[in-house]
């Protein structure tokens, strides 16, 4: 079939080729308007924005004005920035406008491309979000491109992590908003924890343009954004278990699958492919003995007992911390804190914390202060957040390898946009060595040779540790260089700006500096003099003669896309450049995923120490290994989405419930409806009409009403007098209503309505939080059902639905209980109920990677507590010997006094 497809592609072109051909027709129409736009004065060009808005109000569509709008933004860009959109940039803009992904190479001007669909889609007044990966890029792009938008009377907002919510409200109302993916997600969660509509910052999620879309929608797809609060302090347990870990030994095994042979029995096994650690039977026995010795486990009590689940989690976290997570690779120690290093960018992730006790276990391992764990209050994945937008689009230099996932998960087609100038980059064959030491020596020699000829070199590493090893090696060889990793992130912009200078050598961890072009000859100052421009041009020409930027990859990444990102740093906009990867059989990818026969095969080919080979068989093995990992990661992301979709459906119901409450000032009718449902349920539980009278539990019903709802009514007397079920129900409702009416008379109608709303929202939030924790436990345990020949996913759906139904019932019951039992205090203002906040609540960004790396970003926010406030009395109180206003006939002191 693939042969037939190849033949057809050669005859009629690929789908991508045909699509680009069609889009060029639209580009030509835009270009035809260029002379008309040039003839307009600045004021006439600016007035086009209002003209377009008027036409949209007259029922024209955005697509009908696309050609004119793109011509306007192109001309405005020339006048304001002296930058003209190339034809391929117009194609990229059309692709984004159509809600697809535009793959455009490094240096093709994606930042400028985004102005096209952003301007067009902001004309309807619903707003456009341009999403970046960090605050620096959001601020830079907003300042830069904002000049064009402002020229055309469009407002531009910037959302960063350190803004107040008042400033965010203003920013979100702008026509075009630049923001990071993290802040957008957190603001969405915070909005859905607000107590009033006025406290929300976001408006409708209309149109999103995601820059570096592969990084956000693929690399961080399994990254739940979490609002959390602190739980119990287990610092002593973490420290005790940390002291136990050195006593455990690794089990040595050989073979694979069913043919595993235990060569040396041990306490744990390591699954490097899935980044997991498992205790063996010996390990469980040893763990129990050590815990008993430490006083953490009682003699004769099994570690498998339900009450010891937390101990098992702590042990597992400690093992992972010691065995799978390395200092200066996965994290660094900074100011007595464990700071996570982003595996995709090499940047530090200040404030983020791994969850499930992993971060605390690493803190214990490194002997720094152990902070409390957090409990989830609200969460959402990037997958489900970005699917909330009416239209989603994205751009990146590397999307084609993940095109299937973009289509399957997000419904986004990937369109490869041709470069403005053909690429002249030379991708040299990989060089493979037997050991890492030999590989590093070869890299040092390559770098030295390039520096002698004046060719700038960018050395890409996968970790801080490797970047510093190579740096040490270069220092020994007297090779001047710069290191760009998490420890030098403050100097990132300066280092990247000079990375293309003559003879420059830059070591960068993974894709640190991504989003900033490396300019050959170094960066030219914006206000450069003529002499400075001439000097820069000479330097630029010298670098071109030396061969342009040379990329040295120190190992293959697990994803081909990440390798392509590194390659894409070279030969921008048709410049010359070259790339080469240096590998060894000790590299993680080769060691874990490549064939076990690789080493012996290479030795059969005659390899000796210090020698390298270039062989198609090895390259195929590497590519197959990468495909394996990509497939595993895709399956993991898809698996997560299946589970999160269940939670997402429930999340939508809860958030809609909150929105409905916040959208009205008077919730009394809603409360009355809830109260009647609860009373009917009580009747069903105690004295149902479907039961025989002798089976009724009148005493239990009486006690429930009295203790839970503060209603003391003579139920048995009424029943003895022949009062039927319907009349009894009516009297109970009237009794509850009378109590609430009295409270309303005491504090006033408006404060009472506000209090009712606050209690409803707090109750929803509290039990939603508890539900999320229960869902987490269910998800962690449901996979064990597979051993009982049950489908874990179906079991999860079935049980979570039952739990959610129970949650909705519980929320209704607790709302009625709270409003029935609330007491009146003369010294407290009712409006304070909304202001009671838990200052310990945090915004957390959990980043599960191969089911182990769960990171979190921590920013102090304010969220409502579960404490219940009371009213300030505004009217005369009832005397203790006066009749109770509930209608029971009793004195107030013996009823509700």
Curated annotation (Swiss-Prot):
This is Protein translocase subunit SecA. Its EC number is 7.4.2.8. Its main location: membrane. It comes from the Bacteria. The gene is secA. GO terms for molecular function: ATP binding; metal ion binding; protein-exporting ATPase activity. It comes from Vesicomyosocius okutanii subsp. Calyptogena okutanii (strain HA). Zn(2+) binds at residues 884, 886, 895-896. GO terms for biological process: intracellular protein transmembrane transport; protein import; protein targeting; protein transport by the Sec complex.
């Amino acid at each position: 079939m693939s042969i037939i497809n190849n033949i057809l592609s050669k005859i009629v072109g690929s789908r991508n080729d045909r699509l680009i051909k069609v889009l060029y027709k639209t580009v030509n129409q835009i270009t035809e308007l260029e002379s008309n736009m040039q003839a307009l004065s600045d004021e006439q060009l600016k007035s086009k924005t209002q003209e377009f808005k008027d036409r949209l109000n007259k029922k024209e569509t955005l697509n009908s004005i696309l050609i004119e709008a793109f011509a306007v933004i192109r001309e405005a860009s020339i006048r304001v920035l002296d930058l003209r959109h190339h034809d391929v940039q117009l194609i990229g803009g059309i692709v984004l406008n159509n809600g697809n992904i535009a793959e455009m190479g490094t240096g093709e001007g994606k930042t400028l491309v985004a102005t096209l669909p952003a301007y067009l889609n902001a004309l309807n007044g619903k707003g456009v979000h341009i999403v970046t990966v960090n605050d620096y890029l959001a601020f830079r792009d907003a300042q830069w491109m904002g000049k064009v938008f402002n020229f055309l009377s469009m407002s531009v907002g910037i959302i960063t992590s350190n803004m107040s919510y008042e400033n965010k409200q203003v920013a979100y109302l702008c026509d075009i908003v630049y923001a990071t993916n993290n802040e957008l997600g957190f603001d969405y969660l915070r909005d859905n924890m607000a107590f009033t509509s006025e406290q929300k910052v976001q408006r409708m999620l209309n149109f999103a343009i995601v820059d570096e879309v592969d990084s956000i929608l693929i690399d961080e797809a399994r990254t739940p954004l979490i609002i959390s609060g602190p739980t119990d302090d287990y610092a002593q347990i973490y420290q005790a278990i940390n002291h136990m870990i050195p006593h455990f030994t690794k089990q040595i095994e050989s073979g694979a699958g069913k043919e595993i042979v235990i060569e040396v029995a041990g306490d744990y096994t390591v699954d490097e492919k899935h980044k997991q650690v498992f205790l063996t039977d010996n390990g469980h026995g040893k763990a129990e003995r050590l815990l008993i010795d430490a006083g953490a486990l009682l003699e004769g009590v099994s570690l498998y007992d339900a009450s010891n689940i937390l101990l098992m989690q702590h042990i597992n976290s400690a093992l992972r911390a010691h065995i799978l997570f390395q200092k200066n690779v996965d994290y660094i120690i900074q100011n007595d804190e464990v700071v996570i290093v982003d595996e995709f960018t090499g940047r530090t992730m200040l404030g983020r914390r791994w969850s499930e006790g992993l971060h605390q276990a690493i803190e214990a391992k490194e002997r720094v202060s152990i902070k409390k764990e957090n409990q989830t209050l609200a969460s959402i994945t990037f997958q489900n957040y970005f699917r909330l937008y009416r239209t989603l689009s994205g751009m990146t230099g590397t999307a084609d390898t993940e095109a299937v996932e973009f289509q399957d998960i997000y419904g986004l087609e990937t369109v490869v946009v041709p470069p403005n100038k053909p690429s002249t980059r030379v991708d040299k064959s990989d060089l493979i060595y037997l050991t890492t030491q030999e590989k590093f020596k070869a890299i040092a020699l390559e770098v030295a040779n390039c520096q002698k000829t004046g060719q700038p070199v960018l050395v890409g590493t996968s970790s801080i540790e490797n970047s510093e090893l190579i740096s040490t090696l270069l220092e020994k060889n007297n090779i001047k260089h710069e290191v760009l990793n998490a420890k030098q992130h403050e100097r990132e912009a300066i280092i990247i700006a000079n990375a293309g200078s003559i003879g420059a050598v830059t070591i960068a961890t993974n894709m640190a500096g991504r989003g900033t072009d490396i300019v050959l000859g170094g960066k030219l100052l914006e206000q450069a003099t003529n002499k400075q421009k001439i000097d820069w041009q000479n330097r630029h020409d010298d670098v071109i003669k030396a061969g342009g930027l040379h990329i040295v990859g120190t190992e293959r990444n697990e994803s081909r896309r990440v390798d392509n990102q590194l390659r894409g740093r070279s030969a921008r906009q048709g410049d010359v450049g070259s790339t080469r990867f240096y590998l060894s059989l000790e590299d993680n990818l080769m060691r874990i995923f490549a064939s076990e026969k690789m080493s012996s095969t290479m030795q059969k080919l005659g390899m000796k120490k210090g020698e390298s080979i270039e062989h198609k068989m090895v390259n195929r093995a590497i590519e197959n290994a990468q495909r394996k990992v990509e497939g595993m990661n895709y399956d993991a992301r898809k698996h997560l989405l299946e589970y999160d979709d269940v939670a997402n459906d429930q999340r939508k119901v809860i958030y809609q419930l909150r929105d409905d409450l916040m959208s009205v000032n008077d919730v009394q009718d809603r409360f009355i409806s809830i109260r009647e449902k609860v009373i009917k349920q009580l009747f069903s539980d105690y004295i149902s009409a479907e039961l025989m009278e002798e089976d009724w539990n009148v005493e239990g019903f009486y006690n429930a009403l009295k203790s839970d709802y503060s209603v003391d009514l003579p139920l048995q007397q009424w029943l003895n007098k022949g009062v039927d079920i319907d009349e009894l129900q009516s009297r109970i409702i009237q009794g509850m209503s009378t109590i609430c009416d009295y409270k309303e008379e005491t504090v006033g109608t408006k404060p009472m309505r506000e209090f009712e709303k606050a209690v409803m929202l707090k109750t929803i939030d509290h039990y939603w939080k508890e539900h999320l924790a229960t869902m987490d436990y269910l998800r962690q345990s449901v996979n064990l059902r597979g051993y009982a020949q049950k489908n874990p996913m179906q079991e999860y759906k079935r049980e979570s639905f039952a739990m959610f139904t129970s949650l909705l019932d519980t929320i209704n019951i607790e709302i009625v209980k709270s409003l029935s039992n609330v007491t009146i205090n003369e010294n407290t203002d009712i409006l304070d109920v909304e202001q009671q906040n838990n200052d310990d609540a945090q915004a957390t960004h959990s980043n599960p990677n191969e089911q182990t790396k769960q990171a979190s970003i921590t920013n102090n926010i304010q969220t409502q507590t579960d404490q219940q406030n009371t009213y300030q009395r505004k009217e005369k109180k009832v005397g203790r010997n006066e009749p109770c206003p509930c209608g029971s006939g009793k004195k107030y002191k013996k009823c509700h006094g």
